[in-house]
Amino acid sequence: MLSLNQEVHGPKTSEVYGFVGSISIVVATVIFLIWGYVPDKFLESIGIYYYPSKYWAMAMPMYSMVTLLVALVFYIGLNFMSTSKPTSLNTLFDDYSREDVNFLPLMKNGEDRPIDPISDIDITRINDLMFDSHLAK
């Protein structure tokens, strides 16, 4: 029986599952490549008679790639459909936008000015800073 001061040493369950999973993937990949590239006569000579058609050695990766491509196109299209038009003001302002509040609190001589509350920077201010030649320098 373990006391409270003793620790149980050994691998974590997640580490064991990760190791077994990675080894299983390597073994499955090797079996798939052997099945795909070794001639049928050799497989039959070592006693393997039942295996899927060699068509699936090319079809499975191609179906996977096409499925991935269709899912990617669908995902990008769904994102385009769910966003506002570039000319919409909803791309600049929403319910969570915070206007810049300029306030000058009463300060005694020698006191530092407090930090302004957090706010969004107006797009016109950003454009002025980025594209006006006298402000950009």
Swiss-Prot record:
* Cellular localisation: Membrane
Q: Quote the Pfam families the UniProt record gives.
A: PIG-P
Tell me what topology the record assigns in the membrane. Answer: Multi-pass membrane protein
What Gene Ontology cellular-component terms does the record carry?
Answer: membrane
The primary site where this protein sits is membrane
Instruction: State the EC number(s).
Output: 2.4.1.198
Where does this protein act, in terms of pathway?
Answer: Glycolipid biosynthesis; glycosylphosphatidylinositol-anchor biosynthesis
Residues crossing the lipid bilayer are: 16-36, 58-78
| UniProt keyword list | Glycosyltransferase, GPI-anchor biosynthesis, Membrane, Transferase, Transmembrane, Transmembrane helix
Give the top-rank taxon of the lineage listed in the UniProt record for this protein. Answer: Eukaryota
Membrane as a keyword of this entry, yes or no, is yes
| Family per record | Belongs to the PIGP family.
Name the record gives this protein: Phosphatidylinositol N-acetylglucosaminyltransferase subunit P
Origin species, per record, is: Arabidopsis thaliana
